[in-house]
């Protein structure tokens, strides 16, 4: 079978080595004669899987000991509710930075629980979409917390600045599409959350990193399944967790450590992004509408000079083993999601195809 590269924004490509190991262990996990999907989440065998996954995740991100790591249900959208329900306390106002589609979605959900002060950070620089620097974000004195999304998968916009608003500002962030792709200073955040289906593992699992002093503040209306304190006190097993997704995430964490950790992935991700953006920028046939300072290294949207060729581009790229390149319906065009599991060879294959397509149709 010819090599296939999956550029889907999520569920996304998983490391081939992880899939092969999961395949080998699927029906007989560690000699038990059963699948890891079938064993009790409270049995010693799965407890070991869970503990190792958390230890490896902590090591990869250098998570301090005063932070809890929760393995949850609900996805990023679940945390759009989970953040205000857990962090708002007796306050009513929270700051929300709007820099794209997912940040706006978080605002919409938050309105059910609080009064969001929406900081519109979207600007235009030399005709391209960009984001205001953090120094220009007008925060509300005494707000319960600040929420933002460091990487917008649909818009292809990234905010790579490290928050530095002082100890009085609780920073919460949706890292779903950029977690583990670059090093971050966890100490600068009160809560970090990430859906697993992009850089962690399969869909169905959500990771939350929460500072311990923020526990115990949940609203009385907060469902127990979203209550960080309940989840922490029950080691993320208040109810049956998504065990197979948890197991696969653990395999991905071990794979990442074998690759050299997050610092090594950061360098590889930079190489992949530079290669793809280089082809786009040096072409009169393709274009990207995001200012260079805010370009995402994970999600690269691009347009063809003639949109009438979009259908042909997608058909030919799919036939060439380059799958899921269709852009989101909101922005159209193409989008290549190049998360950690996408090898450099996959991006090279894509850029070779793009250059050939341009020669034939430009």
UniProtKB/Swiss-Prot annotation:
The UniProt entry's GO CC annotations, sorted and at most eight, read: cytoplasm
* Family matches, as Gene3D superfamilies: Aspartate Aminotransferase, domain 1, Type I PLP-dependent aspartate aminotransferase-like (Major domain)
Q: What are the N6-(pyridoxal phosphate)lysine sites (modified residues) in this protein?
A: 198
Q: Which domain of life is it from?
A: Bacteria
Where does the UniProt annotation locate this protein? Cytoplasm
> What top-tier enzyme class does this entry carry?
transferase
| EC number, as in UniProt | 2.6.1.52
* Keyword Transferase recorded: yes
List the pathway annotation: Amino-acid biosynthesis; L-serine biosynthesis; L-serine from 3-phospho-D-glycerate: step 2/3; Cofactor biosynthesis; pyridoxine 5'-phosphate biosynthesis; pyridoxine 5'-phosphate from D-erythrose 4-phosphate: step 3/5
Annotated catalysed reactions = O-phospho-L-serine + 2-oxoglutarate = 3-phosphooxypyruvate + L-glutamate; 4-(phosphooxy)-L-threonine + 2-oxoglutarate = (R)-3-hydroxy-2-oxo-4-phosphooxybutanoate + L-glutamate
Q: Which GO molecular function annotations are given, in alphabetical order?
A: O-phospho-L-serine:2-oxoglutarate aminotransferase activity; pyridoxal phosphate binding
Which of this chain's residues are annotated to bind pyridoxal 5'-phosphate?
Answer: 76-77, 102, 153, 174, 197, 239-240
**Keyword line:** Amino-acid biosynthesis, Aminotransferase, Cytoplasm, Pyridoxal phosphate, Pyridoxine biosynthesis, Serine biosynthesis, Transferase
Intrachain S-S bonds: none
List the InterPro entries: Aminotrans_V_dom, Aminotrans_V_PyrdxlP_BS, Pser_aminoTfrase, PyrdxlP-dep_Trfase, PyrdxlP-dep_Trfase_major, PyrdxlP-dep_Trfase_small
Q: Which GO terms describe its biological process?
A: L-serine biosynthetic process; pyridoxine biosynthetic process
**Family that this chain belongs to:** Belongs to the class-V pyridoxal-phosphate-dependent aminotransferase family. SerC subfamily.
In Swiss-Prot or TrEMBL terms, this protein is called Phosphoserine aminotransferase
| Taxonomy of the source species | Bacteria, Pseudomonadati, Pseudomonadota, Gammaproteobacteria, Enterobacterales
